[in-house]
Structures are given as C-alpha cells and as structure tokens.
UniProtKB/Swiss-Prot annotation:
<dbReference type="GO" id="GO:0016628">
    <property type="term" value="F:oxidoreductase activity, acting on the CH-CH group of donors, NAD or NADP as acceptor"/>
</dbReference>
<keyword id="KW-0443">Lipid metabolism</keyword>
<feature type="binding site">
    <location>
        <position position="123"/>
    </location>
    <ligand>
        <name>FAD</name>
    </ligand>
</feature>
<feature type="binding site">
    <location>
        <position position="34"/>
    </location>
    <ligand>
        <name>FAD</name>
    </ligand>
</feature>
<dbReference type="GO" id="GO:0046474">
    <property type="term" value="P:glycerophospholipid biosynthetic process"/>
</dbReference>
<dbReference type="InterPro" id="IPR050407">
    <property type="entry name" value="Geranylgeranyl_reductase"/>
</dbReference>
<dbReference type="Pfam" id="PF12831">
    <property type="entry name" value="FAD_oxidored"/>
</dbReference>
<dbReference type="InterPro" id="IPR011777">
    <property type="entry name" value="Geranylgeranyl_Rdtase_fam"/>
</dbReference>
<dbReference type="Pfam" id="PF22578">
    <property type="entry name" value="GGR_cat"/>
</dbReference>
<keyword id="KW-0444">Lipid biosynthesis</keyword>
<feature type="binding site">
    <location>
        <position position="48"/>
    </location>
    <ligand>
        <name>FAD</name>
    </ligand>
</feature>
<feature type="binding site">
    <location>
        <position position="15"/>
    </location>
    <ligand>
        <name>FAD</name>
    </ligand>
</feature>
<comment type="function">
    <text>Is involved in the reduction of 2,3-digeranylgeranylglycerophospholipids (unsaturated archaeols) into 2,3-diphytanylglycerophospholipids (saturated archaeols) in the biosynthesis of archaeal membrane lipids. Catalyzes the formation of archaetidic acid (2,3-di-O-phytanyl-sn-glyceryl phosphate) from 2,3-di-O-geranylgeranylglyceryl phosphate (DGGGP) via the hydrogenation of each double bond of the isoprenoid chains.</text>
</comment>
<comment type="pathway">
    <text>Membrane lipid metabolism; glycerophospholipid metabolism.</text>
</comment>
<comment type="similarity">
    <text>Belongs to the geranylgeranyl reductase family. DGGGPL reductase subfamily.</text>
</comment>
<feature type="binding site">
    <location>
        <position position="46"/>
    </location>
    <ligand>
        <name>FAD</name>
    </ligand>
</feature>
<dbReference type="InterPro" id="IPR023590">
    <property type="entry name" value="DGGGPL_reductase"/>
</dbReference>
Length: 407
C-alpha cells in the first residue's frame, strides 16, 4: 500500500466498487479498501435487482444469479393478491443475486480496471488540512497508515463514519430507518418465479415482509419495520418474522440469519465537501419505500467515479466543483426517484389495514402488465380519494414523463 493515490474509496460494496472501477478506467490511481476480511459478507439485503438496470453496469454472470423472476405479488392484510409483471415491479424485482459472489465480482472488476484492493483495512479518521479532505488514516493488519488522496469517496454503508468525520449530517431519526431481520430458509414450498411482499400493520408496522426465492427450495425471507413504530414493550422485528415464517413456511429450516438497519430517509442535505463525496447507503441513497439500494448505489458510484476524474483533471476538488460534477448529477437522476418514493412512503405509512385492503381490492383486477397512468389514477380514486390527493405531486410528475416520452 502506497502513501498517495488519486482516489481513495472507503468501502467495497456495490457503490464503492463501481466508483473505484469507473475512476480506474479513466486512468486514475485508485485504492479501494474494505474493513472486513471478505467482501460481500455478511449479506444485509433481500438481494433482488431489476435486470435492465443492472445490465447498465455489468455483464450478467450466472455465477451470481440465483433466480430469474417473472414478477412480484403483493398481499394486503386480508390476503388480497396483486400480481405485477417484472417490468413494472420496481428496482428490486428481476434477478435474485448471490450477493457474496456478486460483491466480490464487482471488486474484481475494479481490480481488473487497475484499482488496488485491500481487505481487512479500516479507516480510523480523515486527514483534513485547510478545510480540505486530503486522505485518511487506515489500520491494516494491526499497522497504521496515512494515505493521502486528491479525492476520498465514502462508501462505508449505513453506519458510515466517513460522512460524520467530514462534517456531513447523516444522522437518522427513527422514522428514517427500518430495522430489518432476514432468514435464508431451505426446504420450503416456495414459488420460484415470483417474489412476494406482505403488508399490514399487524404483520409489519410501517414496513413489509419479503420473500425472494433463491432456487432449490431456498428463499430470503425478511422483514423491515419503521423505527418510529417500534418501542420498548413492542415486539421486535425478529418476533414478527418468526411468527410469519412459522405460519407461512412451517416446514422450513433456517440456514442463515442477518440483522441490520436500512436508511429510508430520502435525500440528505449534502453529500460532498472539499475533497470528498459520499455514495450509496453512506449518502442515504436507498429507496425510501423498499429500502432497496443496490442499483442506486451503483448509479451513484459511477457518477462519483466520473466526477473524481473531472475534478482531478480540472485541478479543482473543492465542494463547489464536486457539487457541479457529482451532487447535481445524482440529485437530477437517482435523487429524483428517491424524492418521488419519499412522497409515496409518507402517504402510505399512515394508512390503516382497512385502507390497505381497500386499495388492494380496487387494484386486484388491474392488468398491470399493460397498466397506464390513467388506469392507476382511476383505481386509486375509487379506493381512496384522500390518498390520491396526497400523491398528486407524484402523478403530476409521472404525467410529465408520459408527455415527454410521446413527443
């Protein structure tokens, strides 16, 4: 490990690896570090991702594909089922990944592009001089290093320390984080062609239960519960999950279990300072509805890698420059989708189970494989006029997209 690089990327998840790969492909000298000894472990997500969006970043490799889904099914509290084709099921439906293999493959791609990759290497602080981030202090195999870099990219996940060290407010309120529990189960009778989502305040307050098939009778079964819906004397997410698994998959065996938090806050005020950018969960770039963040992380990582090249080439790594080449670009793309999802989340978290059932009853006969904006508006208006009014900004934006695509 040298003491000077063009770019130092802290965290080798999808955001960090794509950022490192992109910057290295531009000819920059890049160091990508990961605090754990194995990239991709532990897995902390359902592992679902949209096919076409994924193909923008990588060639599909069967080694890290567990399942190829046709679509998704959403179940309301009374069991009403809404079936949607894969194309309109959102960013988490399409392929189910083997994240341990996938994340390592992304890091390998970064290394192939020319980045130096170091595992079991932890950042312990930033080097800040004259209000500019100049690098970081690292710990590797018990030895301390000072590594300087023209740009630091913080991709250290939901527990990010890099942002806090840089003076960026990434604090999450209870309403801004979902506490999650997930089991990998085996030996269960599971539909291997569709992922399933279960909603309801009795089942998952302020969140949902997910079932993502992984082939061979295996599936990721998990739950996310909004922090504001939890309390000292209320059941824990794992208690809700145990109840669901016992009822839905009584013969299943638990093979793995993971626990963690997912940011669902929407965009934070800033994600860059002099000499530093945040990406992925560290920048709170996950979807506020689903908590899914793989694709957003990869999109933002690519933008950050490109921004690092532009800023370094211009000899200007100031926050003003980084806002121009990174902040504005991700907010106009990834950030726009996050903002729209936040509107929906804030409307739906206050719905009762009766409201959710009413919506499901109105939507169950809609042909989602060819659903138009008008179809959805009519169904929502029939089910809940107040909800439609609360979502008016979202539909106004969607209508603009329809008009733009037709011109």
């Amino acid at each position: 490990m040298k003491d000077k690089y063009d770019v130092l990327v802290i965290g080798a998840g999808p955001a960090g690896s794509i950022a490192a790969k992109t910057a290295a492909e531009k000819g920059l000298d890049v160091l990508l570090i990961e605090k754990r000894q194995e990239i991709g472990d532990p897995v902390r997500c359902a592992e679902g991702v949209n096919k076409e969006c994924l193909k923008k970043h990588v060639e599909i490799d069967k080694r890290w594909i567990c399942a190829d889904l046709k679509g998704s099914c959403i179940f309301s509290p009374d069991g009403t089922k809404i079936e949607m084709a894969e194309e309109i099921s959102g960013g988490e439906v399409g392929y189910v990944l083997e994240r341990k293999v996938f994340d390592r493959a992304l890091a390998e791609h970064a290394a192939t592009a020319g980045a130096e990759v170091r595992v079991k290497t932890r950042a312990t602080g930033l080097i800040i001089e004259d209000d500019f981030v100049k690098g970081a202090r690292l710990m590797h195999l018990g030895k301390e290093y000072e590594v300087r870099a023209s740009i630091v990219i913080g991709a250290d996940g939901v527990e990010s320390k890099v942002g806090r060290w840089a003076g960026i407010d990434t604090a999450l309120k209870p309403v801004d984080v979902e506490t999650c529990a997930q089991y990998l189960i085996a030996g269960a009778d599971i539909n291997q062609e569709y992922c399933e989502f279960y909603i309801g305040n009795e089942m998952a307050p302020g969140g949902y239960v997910w079932v993502f098939p992984k082939g061979g009778g295996k599936a990721n079964v998990g739950i996310g519960i909004l922090g504001s819906k939890m309390g000292k004397f209320k059941p824990r997410p794992v208690d809700y999950l145990n109840d669901f698994v016992q009822k839905k998959f009584p013969d299943a065996r638990i093979v793995e279990m993971v626990f963690g938090g997912v940011p669902v806050s929407g965009s934070i005020e800033k994600t860059s300072v002099n000499g530093l950018m945040l990406v992925g969960d560290a920048a709170r770039q996950s979807d506020p509805i689903t908590g899914g963040g793989i694709l957003n992380a990869m999109d933002a990582g690519k933008l950050a890698g490109e921004a690092a090249y532009e800023a370094i080439s211009a000899g200007d790594v100031s926050v003003v420059k980084l806002e121009e080449v990174y902040e504005k670009k991700w907010r106009d793309t990834v950030g726009h989708d996050i903002d729209m999802s936040l509107i929906v989340k804030n409307c739906f978290i206050n719905l009762t189970d009766d409201d959710l059932d009413s919506l499901a009853h109105s939507l169950k006969d809609v042909k989602f494989e060819r659903m138009s904006l008008l179809d959805l508006l009519q169904a929502l208006f029939k089910a809940n006029k107040k909800l439609l009014w609360d979502l008016r900004v979202l539909f106004k934006d969607a209508a603009k997209e329809v008009i733009k695509n037709k011109t």
